[in-house]
Amino acid sequence: MNPLLTIVIPVLNEAPILSERLEALQFVRCRGVELIVVDGGSTDDSFDIASARSDHTLKAAAGRAKQMNEGARHANGEWLLFLHADTRLGEEAFDALLEALSGESDWGWFDVHIEGKHPLLLVTAAMMNARAGLTKVATGDQGLFMKKALFDAVGGFPDMPLMEDVALSKALRGIAKSKVVRTPLVTDGRRWDQGGWLRTVLKMWGLRFAYWAGVGPDRLADYYAHVRGR
């Protein structure tokens, strides 16, 4: 019998955190969830680490959209949950997800808590959660989940280097009922800690505004790579 849920995790050179994160997810496998990790060409030990701690470990071209689509293609679950490697799904959040899957909605996302050093990360998370609730557009940090049949019907994630999560949310919100799981995922605040809180927030807002203004994803990706390299 096929599982109710498949979790798909795209990774690229995540060896320093991957073992701990996958070990923390073993409880879902004990509860019948299929766990798929898709490696985008890591040069560290990510693939081997994932192989020992997942049901399927796949290889794909680098890029979250490509990797997540590849994972979904091999998934056997009725539902899909796309989870970033630096985001934790605790048991309470998992139980809340199962409750959501038994409802009338066809897709949704979680509220998020950002774990980091800066006190304003609480405000950042609150703003992310409020924005998603208002616009019904969620980001990958918020753990997008949906029926596999719905994911296939809209063609999966658009093949974009950035904003693939936003684009998929926009496609789904117009055709299916959504659900917000209020028990939060916990995501790593390392990008805010390393890049500086204000600079990182301004960069993310700038990217989102440019996307909404019609700037193409390839140009956005070039800009993102440029500012990350500073």
Predicted regions and their residues:
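Acidic helix N-cap motif at the loop->helix transition within catalytic regions
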Residues: 16-20, 44-52, 92
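Short, well-formed alpha-helical segments that are part of the catalytic scaffolds
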Residues: 13-27
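A conserved acidic beta->alpha catalytic loop
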Residues: 39-47, 87
